[in-house]
């Protein structure tokens, strides 16, 4: 898989969207009503996209070592989650998620249960997900990806 600006952009957008879907489904089920977990009312959770790109760029060489890949993905995603939680709390003066009730948590920002999940999801994305995603994107007709032509506004003075 070739990582370039386009492929990293695809990984970022798709994983941001899939993260939003997962977060929204879980929050909706737990709350009993629709809960949009996206950023700025859009269908994206940017931490998932950012972490997806980080893992793709950093750990592609570990594809032949799945155990090391798992622990690398787990650590990187957990650090990203902790940093994001701290930044969001500092910027918005509220905790966006709280794992204080879970075993083996660090200040309620991260916990072992989700770190293991991030490790498994990160490993799956690096081993298979990114390749499948980019193969699917390669099936999109080129004309759909071309930017629309920009025509200058008609001049009021001739």
Give a label for each model feature:
Residues 1-158:
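Aromatic-rich, lipid-facing transmembrane alpha helices and their immediate juxtamembrane interface loops
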């Amino acid at each position: 898989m070739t990582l370039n600006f386009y492929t990293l952009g695809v990984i970022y957008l798709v994983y941001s969207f899939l993260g939003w879907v997962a977060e929204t489904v879980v929050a909706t089920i737990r709350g009993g009503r629709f809960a949009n977990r996206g950023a700025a009312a859009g269908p994206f959770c940017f931490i998932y996209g950012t972490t997806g790109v980080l893992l793709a760029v950093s750990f592609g060489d570990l594809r032949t070592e799945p155990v090391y890949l798992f622990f690398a993905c787990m650590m990187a995603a957990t650090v990203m989650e902790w940093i994001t939680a701290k930044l969001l709390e500092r910027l918005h003066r509220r905790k966006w998620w709280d794992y204080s009730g879970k075993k083996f948590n660090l200040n309620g920002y991260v916990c072992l249960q989700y770190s293991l999940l991030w490790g498994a999801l990160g490993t799956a994305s690096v081993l298979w997900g990114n390749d499948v995603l980019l193969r699917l994107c390669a099936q999109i007709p080129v004309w759909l990806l071309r930017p629309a032509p920009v025509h200058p506004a008609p001049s009021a003075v001739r």
